[in-house]
C-alpha cells in the first residue's frame, strides 16, 4: 500500500499528456459554445494526438501503473474530450434539428462512460478492443464537420451508431505500426490544413479533401468489423 498520498507521487510523464488531452477537450467545448466550430474540431483532434501519445510514452518509459492512477487519468480525460466535446459540438452546430441533438448528446456521453468503465475493469491487453474505442467518436464528428458536407441529421445518425457500437461487444483491432502512423499523419495533416485556413485565412483547397480522407478512413475502421465475413475458398 502506498503511504505517500501526495499527488506528485502518483503523477508520471504520461499523465501530463492525459492532462493536455483533457485541456484540449475543455477548450474544444468552450470554442463550440462560442461558435468557433472549426477550431473546436482542431482541439478535439489535438486531444486524440495527446491520447495516442500518453500510451506510447507509458510503454517507452516502462511505467508500472500499480494503483491504476494513469488508467483512471486517461479515462477521465477521454470522457471530456471524446464524450462531452463531441456532444457539445453537434448541439452547437445544430440549427434546424437542435432538439434531436439534445437527445443524441447525452447518448454519446453515457455510452462513452460505459465503454470506458468496461475497459477499466477488463484485465489484459489483447489485440482487439471490445466495443468501438471512444476516441473514434471525436475523430468521426470532427472530420465530418470539417469536410464541408456536414448535415445535422446525418451527424445525429452517425453519432447514434457510434454510441451504440461503443457499448457493443464487437471486436475492434488495435491500430499500431503502419496503420497508427498513417492515422496520426492524417490527423496532423487535417489539424495543420484547417489551422492554416483559420489563422492565415488561406484558401481551403487542402483542408476539405484532407478531412474527407480522414472521415472516410474512420468510417472504414468503424464498418469493417461489422461487415459479414466471406469464406475464402
Swiss-Prot record:
Coiled-coil stretches noted in the UniProt entry, renumbered to this chain: none
UniProt keywords, alphabetically: Lipid biosynthesis, Lipid metabolism, Membrane, Phospholipid biosynthesis, Phospholipid metabolism, Transferase, Transmembrane, Transmembrane helix
Catalytic reaction list: CDP-2,3-bis-O-(geranylgeranyl)-sn-glycerol + L-serine = archaetidylserine + CMP + H(+); CDP-2,3-bis-O-(phytanyl)-sn-glycerol + L-serine = 2,3-bis-O-phytanyl-sn-glycero-3-phospho-L-serine + CMP + H(+)
Protein name: Archaetidylserine synthase
Intracellular or extracellular location(s): Membrane
Gene Ontology BP terms: glycerophospholipid metabolic process; phospholipid biosynthetic process
Pathway: Membrane lipid metabolism; glycerophospholipid metabolism
Keyword Transmembrane helix in record: yes
A GO-annotated cellular component: membrane
Keyword Lipid biosynthesis tagged: yes
Amino acid at each position: 500500500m502506498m503511504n505517500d498520498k501526495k499527488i506528485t507521487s502518483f503523477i508520471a510523464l504520461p499523465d501530463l499528456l492525459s492532462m493536455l488531452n483533457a485541456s484540449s477537450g475543455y477548450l474544444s467545448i468552450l470554442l463550440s459554445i462560442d461558435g468557433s466550430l472549426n477550431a473546436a474540431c482542431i482541439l478535439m483532434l489535438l486531444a486524440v494526438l495527446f491520447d495516442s501519445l500518453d500510451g506510447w510514452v507509458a510503454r517507452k518509459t516502462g511505467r508500472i501503473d500499480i494503483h491504476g492512477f494513469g488508467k483512471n487519468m486517461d479515462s477521465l480525460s477521454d470522457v471530456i474530450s471524446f464524450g462531452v466535446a463531441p456532444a457539445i459540438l453537434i448541439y452547437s452546430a445544430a440549427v434546424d434539428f437542435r432538439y434531436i441533438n439534445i437527445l443524441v448528446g447525452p447518448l454519446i456521453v453515457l455510452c462513452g462512460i460505459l465503454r470506458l468503465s468496461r475497459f477499466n475493469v477488463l484485465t489484459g491487453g489483447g489485440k482487439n478492443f471490445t466495443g468501438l474505442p471512444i476516441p473514434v467518436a471525436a475523430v468521426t464528428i470532427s472530420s465530418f464537420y470539417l469536410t464541408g458536407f456536414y448535415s445535422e441529421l446525418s451527424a445525429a445518425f452517425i453519432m447514434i451508431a457510434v454510441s451504440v457500437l461503443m457499448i457493443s461487444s464487437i471486436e475492434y483491432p488495435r491500430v499500431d505500426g503502419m496503420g497508427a502512423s498513417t492515422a496520426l499523419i492524417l490527423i496532423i495533416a487535417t489539424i495543420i490544413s484547417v489551422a492554416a485556413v483559420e489563422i492565415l485565412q488561406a484558401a481551403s483547397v487542402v483542408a476539405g479533401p484532407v478531412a474527407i480522407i480522414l472521415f472516410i478512413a474512420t468510417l472504414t475502421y468503424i464498418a469493417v468489423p461489422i461487415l459479414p465475413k466471406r469464406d475464402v475458398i
